[in-house]
């Protein structure tokens, strides 16, 4: 389901203001303020996301209007009809899903967040003719975890109390009855949601709606981590904190086991399907996909525990026989779970059926056609660039639409490739630096082309066989007008050459009214994790980084550097960090800082570094080098020791503790000399309710530093009560950025040999 609150009626015929291949710098005199960038986020481009629907006319979609009503609109003609009036929408509606024939709406209400993607809710089915609402479960109490229509609309599968149910014409069948705290049916446990599936469901209907494949997770034996909540959303703290008992497997600990099940909806028969690609205790199922137009074949992408070996196992539904149809060895690094398998069918005159997937088996991530029956794959794209997303598959035209880095790793352009001729066609001018995306209609005849930067984003509507837009969908004219009042930091992009000959992508933000004759402090803002990317030519939000480059009392240059190990520059570039996280990443950030220090407009004595999550870890590893290149470090929600993080993420890059003990020891932040010597000190921030990167990381790091004699003038610590990894509880986010602003101001004003308090010069007796 996609929310949209913007009407498309009356949109411009085409984009009024041409965009430039660089970020805007404004044409006014106003400077961005803290309140505008951090508190209110006042200047933000908008975009619509539509839920395309299949009707007699291609280009129809459903959206929720500003008054709350559900409407169907033709993106081609702008004709609009009301599906559900505003006064018939259920109270406290959070989300909705439309019946395939538009006869009913499935509503989620009474929303309660769980983890990153998951939530609990009540669900109601609304008949569009009578507008009557029926509860999906009569006794529901905000406890349903997931619900989904079949592709044909004959039934709804839903998950409650970790059990799978099927609703058909007001009759409900319970499919599993063993769900509980340690057994999950149809929904992932915490680690599969966070690290593998990246979503809140683990069930998939066959294309014809006859079968349901779902995963069953068994957490028996998985160690428990306790997260305390001191306030627990109360105004006055309870005498005893609420404790969340979370099954959280850390490095080399027991992982949940996973099992594939098939349900035939007509008979209600459920069958477990063994996947023997790897030992059951080692098996990770990364993806489930139906490789058929009906219900003949379902496939799973299976990995070993450390995710450097992969097998695609196809299951014949009729016989339940399984066969490995594709296999990869990635022991030179790791294998990413890209969730990109999709059925194509026969190609050309051949009756052999194929599916498409993204694979970096050539050293670069590209599109490949794999035979469903097994055999040699066919490369659709190739070269020293990478495919990042499959957007649409047009079977009648035999085309795949995709995004790639063909022009540059910091850019995304839209292309199609024919699986008949292998001809690649750009749908945008790929010689102009930009980031694009697109959303295709249900029959593939139209698409919304989204320009995402570096200039102010906009969206145009195209017909698939036209090179000119039909009209503009979103112009963001209000943002363009607002920017006329401001003068903005100047964002530039370049590459730094390492001694090895490799290059690092850099995004530099120069302060407002920059003068090359002045010297400015610098803030490095890395993330730096495996496969990640921060340096992108997408629109850069007018956020905290824009603020510190605008405030006349701060005027910081910011550098964002994508170190070795980050994504979209080929397998060799990213896999160098395997089994030694923190080493090359820190070396690259130090190298970049040393290069920055040589610039005539950089104050080499005031170069700071701040990172969040993996960026917080990387900041710590940089400080640990004791290079002298950085004068201040800020670590927000950092990992400090990979033994403390979850197994499925960590072992993908570090292998097991038993096989790589030396690597784990080297990757932990334990050397204190850099913390003692960093001239402006270090600030460590962490939420006590972080269920992802546990507060344990900061607690252990601070104990190491204090125990080793790091002084109070060098170390400041700030915890955020009950905040999770995003640090937003009870105003924590604004406090965090105010504190960071204060530290950056103090660092800018810090004198190299300033006087200190007398008690800091001698031992305290």
From Swiss-Prot:
Any one of the GO CC terms: extracellular region
Keyword annotations from UniProtKB, A to Z: Aminopeptidase, Glycoprotein, Hydrolase, Protease, Secreted, Serine protease, Signal, Virulence
Cited Pfam families: DPPIV_N, Peptidase_S9
Active site at 613, 690, 725
Q: MF terms per GO, please? A: aminopeptidase activity; dipeptidyl-peptidase activity; peptidase activity; serine-type peptidase activity
Going by the UniProt annotation, this protein carries glycans at 35, 78, 101, 110, 169, 218, 465, 490, 665
The cross-references to InterPro entries, in alphabetical order and at most eight, read: AB_hydrolase_fold, Peptidase_S9_cat, Peptidase_S9B_N, Serine_Prot_S9B/DPPIV
Give the residue range of the signal peptide: 1-14
Q: Could you confirm whether the keyword Protease appears in this record?
A: yes
Family to which the UniProt record says this protein belongs: Belongs to the peptidase S9B family.
Q: What does this protein's UniProt record list under function?
A: Extracellular dipeptidyl-peptidase which removes N-terminal dipeptides sequentially from polypeptides having unsubstituted N-termini provided that the penultimate residue is proline. Contributes to pathogenicity.
Q: What is the protein named?
A: Probable dipeptidyl peptidase 4
Source species of the chain = Aspergillus fumigatus (strain ATCC MYA-4609 / CBS 101355 / FGSC A1100 / Af293)
């Amino acid at each position: 389901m996609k929310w949209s609150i913007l009407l498309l009626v009356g949109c411009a015929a085409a984009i009024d203001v041409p965009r430039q291949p660089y970020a805007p710098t404004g044409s006014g005199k106003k400077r961005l303020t803290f309140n505008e960038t951090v508190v209110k986020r006042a200047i933000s481009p908008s975009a619509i996301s539509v839920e395309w629907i299949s009707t007699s006319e291609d280009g129809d979609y459903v959206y929720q209007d500003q008054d709350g009503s559900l409407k169907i609109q033709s993106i081609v003609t702008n004709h609009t009809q009301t599906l559900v009036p505003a006064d018939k929408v259920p109270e406290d509606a959070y989300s909705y899903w439309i019946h395939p024939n538009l006869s009913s709406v499935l509503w989620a209400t009474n929303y309660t967040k769980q983890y990153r993607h998951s939530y609990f809710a009540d669900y109601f089915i609304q008949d569009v003719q009578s507008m009557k609402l029926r509860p999906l479960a009569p006794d529901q109490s905000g406890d349903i975890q997931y619900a989904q229509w079949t592709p044909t609309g004959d039934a709804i599968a839903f998950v409650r109390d970790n059990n799978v149910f099927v609703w058909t014409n007001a009759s409900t069948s319970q499919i599993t009855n063993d769900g509980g705290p340690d057994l999950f049916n149809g929904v992932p446990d915490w680690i599969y949601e966070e690290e593998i599936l990246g979503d809140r469901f683990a069930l998939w209907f066959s294309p014809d709606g006859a079968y349901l494949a779902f995963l069953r997770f068994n957490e028996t034996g998985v160690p428990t981590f306790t997260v305390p909540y001191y306030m627990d959303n109360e105004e006055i703290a309870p005498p005893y904190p609420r404790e969340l008992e979370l099954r959280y497997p850390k490095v080399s600990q027991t992982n949940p086991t996973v099992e594939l099940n098939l349900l035939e909806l007509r008979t209600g028969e459920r069958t477990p399907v063994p996947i023997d690609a790897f030992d059951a205790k080692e098996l990770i199922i990364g993806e489930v996909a139906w490789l058929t137009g009906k219900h003949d074949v379902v496939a799973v992408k299976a990995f070993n525990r450390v995710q450097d070996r992969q097998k695609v196992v196809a299951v014949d539904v009729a016989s339940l026989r399984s066969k490995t149809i594709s296999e990869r060895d990635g022991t030179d690094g790791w294998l990413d779970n890209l969730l990109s398998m999709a059925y194509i069918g026969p190609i050309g005159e051949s009756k052999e059926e194929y599916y498409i997937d993204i694979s970096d088996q050539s050293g670069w991530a590209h599109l490949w056609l794999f035979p469903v029956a097994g055999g040699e794959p066919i490369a659709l794209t190739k070269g020293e660039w990478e495919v990042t997303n499959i957007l649409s598959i047009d079977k009648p035209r035999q085309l795949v639409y995709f995004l790639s880095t063909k022009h540059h790793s910091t850019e995304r352009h839209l292309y199609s490739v024919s699986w008949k001729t292998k001809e690649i066609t750009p749908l945008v001018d790929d010689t102009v630096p930009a980031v694009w995306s697109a959303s295709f209609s249900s029959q593939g005849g139209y698409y919304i082309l989204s320009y995402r930067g570096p200039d102010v984003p906009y969206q145009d509507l195209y017909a698939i066989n036209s090179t000119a837009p039909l009209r503009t969908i979103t112009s963001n004219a209000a943002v363009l007008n607002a920017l006329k009042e401001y003068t903005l930091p100047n964002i530039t992009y370049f590459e730094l050459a390492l001694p090895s000959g490799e290059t690092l992508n850099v995004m530099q933000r120069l302060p407002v009214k920059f003068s090359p004759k002045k010297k400015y402090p610098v803030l490095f803002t890395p993330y730096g994790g495996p496969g990640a990317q921060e340096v992108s030519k997408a629109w850069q939000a007018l956020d905290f980084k824009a603020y510190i480059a605008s405030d006349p009392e701060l005027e910081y240059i910011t550098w964002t550097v994508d170190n070795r190990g980050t994504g979209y520059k080929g397998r060799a570039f990213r896999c160098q960090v395997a089994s030694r996280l923190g080493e090359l990443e820190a070396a690259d950030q130090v190298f970049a800082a040393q290069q920055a220090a040589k610039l005539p407009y950089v104050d080499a004595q005031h170069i700071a570094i701040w990172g969040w999550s993996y960026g917080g870890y990387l900041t710590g590893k940089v400080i640990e080098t004791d290079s002298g290149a950085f004068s201040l470090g800020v670590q927000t929600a950092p990992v400090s020791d990979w033994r403390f993080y979850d197994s499925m993420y960590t072992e993908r890059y570090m292998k097991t503790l038993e096989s790589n003990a030396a690597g784990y020891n080297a990757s932990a932040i334990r050397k204190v000399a850099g913390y003692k010597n960093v001239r402006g000190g270090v600030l460590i921030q962490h939420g006590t309710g972080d269920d992802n990167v546990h507060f344990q990381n900061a607690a252990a790091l601070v104990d190491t530093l204090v125990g080793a004699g790091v002084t109070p003038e060098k170390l400041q610590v700030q915890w955020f009560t009950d905040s999770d990894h995003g640090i937003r509880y009870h105003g924590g986010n604004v406090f965090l950025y105010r504190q960071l602003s204060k530290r950056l101001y103090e660092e800018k004003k810090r004198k190299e040999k300033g006087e200190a308090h007398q008690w800091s010069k001698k031992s305290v007796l």
